[in-house]
From Swiss-Prot:
Keywords: Pheromone response, Pheromone-binding, Transport. This is Pheromone-binding protein 1. One of its GO terms (molecular function) is pheromone binding. Antenna. GO terms for biological process: response to pheromone. Belongs to the PBP/GOBP family. This major soluble protein in olfactory sensilla of male moths might serve to solubilize the extremely hydrophobic pheromone molecules and to transport pheromone through the aqueous lymph to receptors located on olfactory cilia. Homodimer. InterPro entries: Odorant/phero-bd_Lep, PBP_GOBP_sf.
Length: 35
């Protein structure tokens, strides 16, 4: 269901954000990853 996907994305995105800030990954790389 959409709601489950949304929750998974949110749960996945939080640690991703932390990693991104630690590694200083540009947003473009993250966008590529999600597309």
């Amino acid at each position: 269901s959409k709601e489950v996907m949304k929750q998974m994305t949110i749960n996945f995105a939080k640690p991703m954000e932390a990693c991104k800030q630690e590694l200083n990954v540009p947003d473009a790389v993250v966008q590529d990853f999600f597309n």
